[in-house]
Amino acid sequence: YLTNCEAHCKQGDIVYIHYSGHGQLMTDLDGDEAMRWTGRHSEWDESWIPYDAYMTYCPQDRGERHFSDDEVAQFLQQIRRRIGSKGQLIVAIDACHSGDATCGDDDECVRGVDIKFNIPRRPGTPSAKPIEEQWLTISACKPYQLSSEVKGKRVGKLSYALYTLGRKTINMSRSTLEKRLADIFRTYESRIRQTPMVTGRK
């Protein structure tokens, strides 16, 4: 999808990419996370889970079915080059990368998987520098939080909040957008506390 998106982009375009689904931590093979984080975050990439991906490493899926944050960043970097400095690139991620990806007794769904996708490391794996964030990222929660759905609506809180705000988000500043999203999140507050984040630049 992102490859097709890039092919249709031109200078000055406004590009909006929205991922709503489950996320999972997977082994960081190129070492870029160690330059960004310390502790447990330094060994794992965040990934999006397509419908045909497996939850654990196996002959049918050695990680190639997952969409790691490194791969996402490379595609976004290519789109940024196509649209240039006058274009706008906005990425919304309605997922988290931990949790149980199930509905509990209170019908509250978490959009993450608590099992890490562990890929056997090869010795001497080179380190790579993280790609600079040249786009605006709207995240459903902070890295240590869980992302949940709006109870009774079967839709992620971030997706619902962005739908509520509509096209007005395009011209909002980062701080205003964060505040407006947080206000909507509070309307649907539940036992799972999550704080929306806006990082990077358009």
Label every PLM stretch briefly:
Residues 63-70, 136, 144-160:
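A short beta-strand-to-alpha-helix junction
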Residues 20, 51-55, 141-143, 147-148, ...:
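Cell-envelope and extracellular/periplasmic
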Residues 36, 110-112, 155-160:
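Short, low-complexity, polar/charged sequence segments that are solvent-exposed and flexible
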Residues 129, 142, 161, 165-202:
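Caspase-like cysteine protease fold
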Residues 43, 131-133, 157:
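Short, solvent-exposed loop/turn segments at the edges of secondary structure
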Residues 89, 95-152:
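Extracellular S/T/G-rich loop segment that most often corresponds to the catalytic His/Ser-adjacent loop
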Residues 1-20, 24-106, 172-180:
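Caspase-like (clan CD) cysteine peptidase catalytic core
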